[in-house]
């Protein structure tokens, strides 16, 4: 049996500070499965409007399609 892929936690904006905060918040969980926090580099710096939300859809889908190794995807947006 193969090991499960990582849980991919996606920050849908391009603000690396937010992604760093996610890593810090999730860093105390057990190591398996791995939790990998990534930034959507093609996203807006912040998501403050419907236009910003709409702008992340295609880059987000592209990122997910490029990571079939992941066991799960979490879109970390509030």
Regions found by a protein language model. Name each.
Residues 54-78:
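Glycine/small-residue-rich loop that forms an oxyanion/phosphate-binding "nest" at active or ligand-binding sites
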Residues 2-59:
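N-terminal glycine-rich anion-binding loop in soluble enzyme alpha/beta folds
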């Amino acid at each position: 049996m193969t090991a499960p892929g990582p849980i991919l936690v996606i920050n849908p904006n391009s603000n690396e500070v937010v992604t760093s905060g996610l890593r810090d918040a999730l860093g105390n969980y057990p190591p398996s499965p791995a939790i990998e926090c990534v930034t959507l580099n093609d996203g807006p710096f912040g998501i403050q409007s419907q236009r910003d939300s709409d702008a992340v859809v295609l880059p987000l889908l592209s990122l997910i399609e490029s990571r079939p190794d992941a066991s799960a995807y979490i879109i970390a947006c509030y």
